[in-house]
């Protein structure tokens, strides 16, 4: 049973994280009459602009997070990013507050060490070789063990922050410092990963719901500086690789438990599959589903966390997304050329996130297109994204 938003019997959802992904989740929650309270570390975040109420706080501050939960009394808490006081979430869950998919999943996936040890050591899934390092001395030893080239990441970061590819020992200090500065919780442990000989990587959106586990068609994507630039669906791959990918994804989401959509990242070479990472929430590369499917990843996540059946997922054919990425400094971002951008590609769509400010490089929107094949859809989406003029 759901109540009506703003009424005494309202069903309330607290979004912890109010970026562009949270904004789409908020919209989908409101389709079921759910009252949405959006929280983030800064004011006027995208999801706050469509929520019933908004709160600004440091979500790594456990006392502040608990005070907010006590104030709004949510029926469910929906983590939408990694920088959260997960120990407090776990305690709240023990006290009867519903966290989706669950507090353990949020804890494990916030920290690369937790999810990597679960996948490789508990579930026995194939991954890249890895070592963790807490100190500079341990880092040097880990690089020596893994060998060059290797990938260095903070155990707590996202969107490529603090990540680097180390190819030369002369860059050892630089790589360590970059990882320390890029972690979400400040200085801390890093993971040193060996290269795997993959041909491409995919995101397999996997939904765990009351009516079982469901898979979206695989999503391919291109990354630059650790963050995605374009994504497309479906990614072409062998039947064996797809079947193996589903096996790996199902094992991971079953181990994490709870209901929701999980973005499972995998490396692929031929029929071989390696597990990379997982997020227990919608994935940025999955924004392509806003145009590629009848139920977007956000709609699927909301159905699952509300305990509703997913049913059948219909994919419309080759589709792509391309980000509107700009660099500058402003607290009054304006856009022009939107009509011209949409006119470039009949049927194309554009989402501007409404981010209140920019300081450096930031993702401000996404262009979406469908075509006869994925490469064409990618080029069309890129053309639409490039035509948008951003004024600072």
Swiss-Prot record:
Gene3D superfamilies: 3.40.50.20, ATP-grasp fold, A domain, ATP-grasp fold, B domain. It catalyses: N(1)-(5-phospho-beta-D-ribosyl)glycinamide + formate + ATP = N(2)-formyl-N(1)-(5-phospho-beta-D-ribosyl)glycinamide + ADP + phosphate + H(+). PROSITE patterns: ATP_GRASP (PS50975). GO terms for cellular component: cytosol. Pathway: Purine metabolism; IMP biosynthesis via de novo pathway; N(2)-formyl-N(1)-(5-phospho-D-ribosyl)glycinamide from N(1)-(5-phospho-D-ribosyl)glycinamide (formate route): step 1/1. ATP binds at residues 112, 153, 158-163, 193-196, 201. It is an enzyme of class 6 (ligase). Belongs to the PurK/PurT family. Involved in the de novo purine biosynthesis. Catalyzes the transfer of formate to 5-phospho-ribosyl-glycinamide (GAR), producing 5-phospho-ribosyl-N-formylglycinamide (FGAR). Formate is provided by PurU via hydrolysis of 10-formyl-tetrahydrofolate. NCBIfam families: PRK09288.1, purT. This is Formate-dependent phosphoribosylglycinamide formyltransferase.
């Amino acid at each position: 049973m759901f109540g009506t938003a703003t009424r005494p019997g309202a069903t309330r959802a607290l979004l912890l994280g109010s970026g562009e992904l949270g904004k789409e989740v908020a919209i989908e929650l409101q389709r079921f009459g759910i009252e949405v309270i959006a929280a983030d570390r800064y004011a006027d975040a995208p999801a706050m602009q469509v929520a019933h109420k908004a709160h600004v706080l440091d979500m790594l501050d456990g006392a502040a997070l608990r005070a907010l939960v006590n104030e709004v009394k949510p029926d469910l808490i929906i983590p939408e990013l990694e920088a959260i006081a997960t120990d407090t979430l776990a305690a709240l869950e023990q006290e009867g507050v519903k966290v989706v998919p669950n507090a353990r999943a949020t804890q494990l996936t916030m920290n690369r060490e937790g999810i990597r040890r679960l996948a490789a050591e508990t579930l026995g899934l194939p991954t890249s070789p890895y070592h963790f390092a807490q100190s500079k001395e341990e880092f040097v030893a880990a690089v020596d063990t893994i060998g060059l080239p290797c990938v260095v990441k903070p155990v707590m970061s996202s969107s490529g922050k603090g990540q680097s590819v180390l190819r030369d020992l002369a860059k050892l200090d630089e790589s360590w410092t970059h990882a320390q500065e890029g972690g979400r919780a400040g200085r801390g442990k890093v993971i040193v990963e060996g290269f795997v000989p993959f041909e491409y990587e995919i995101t397999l959106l996997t939904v765990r719901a009351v009516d079982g586990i469901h898979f979206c068609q695989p999503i391919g994507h291109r990354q630059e500086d650790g963050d995605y630039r374009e994504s497309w669906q479906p990614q072409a791959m062998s039947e064996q690789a797809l079947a193996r990918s589903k096996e790996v994804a199902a094992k991971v989401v079953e181990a994490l438990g709870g209901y929701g959509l999980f973005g499972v990242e995998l490396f692929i070479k031929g029929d071989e599959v390696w597990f990379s990472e997982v997020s227990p929430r919608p994935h940025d590369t999955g924004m392509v589903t806003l145009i590629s499917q009848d139920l977007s990843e956000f709609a699927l996540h909301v159905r699952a966390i509300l305990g509703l059946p997913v049913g059948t997922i219909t994919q419309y054919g080759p589709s792509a997304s391309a980000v509107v990425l700009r660099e500058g400094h402003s607290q009054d971002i304006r856009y022009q050329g939107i009509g011209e951008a949409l006119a470039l590609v009949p049927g194309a769509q554009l989402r501007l996130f409404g981010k209140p400010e920019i300081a450096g490089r930031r993702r401000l929107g996404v262009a979406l297109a469908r075509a006869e094949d994925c490469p064409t859809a990618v080029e069309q989406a890129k053309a639409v994204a490039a035509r948008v003029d951003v004024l600072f």
